Amino acid sequence: MHKLVAGVAGFVLAVLMLAGCAGDDGTTGVTVEAKEMRFTPKSATLGAGRQVVTVHNAGHLRHTFSINSLGEEVTVNPGQTKTLAVELAPGTYRYVCRVLDHEGLGMRGTLHVN
């Protein structure tokens, strides 16, 4: 009986978490972690339309999250989390950290939009 209750509770929790992925206005998004000289994930796939990118700086240095082709950028200090709402057409978008040579040291990634 306890296994059944635990299984049902786990299923309900999973459904609630998935329901929380879309905003009231139809937005969806991705969370990117910035840490010394890397972004995680290095790439993500999203649907076209309004997307929210949440950037969390888990490192000890200041970073930026820049989508140059859209002219969008946020600066994220250590321990901070910031969001960036963008309208994405199908295509590929590169994101980078523009602090010093962080991009050259590996802080870059790609958003694939279907």
Go through the PLM ranges and name each one.
Residues 16-30:
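C-terminal region of N-terminal signal peptides and the immediate post-cleavage residues
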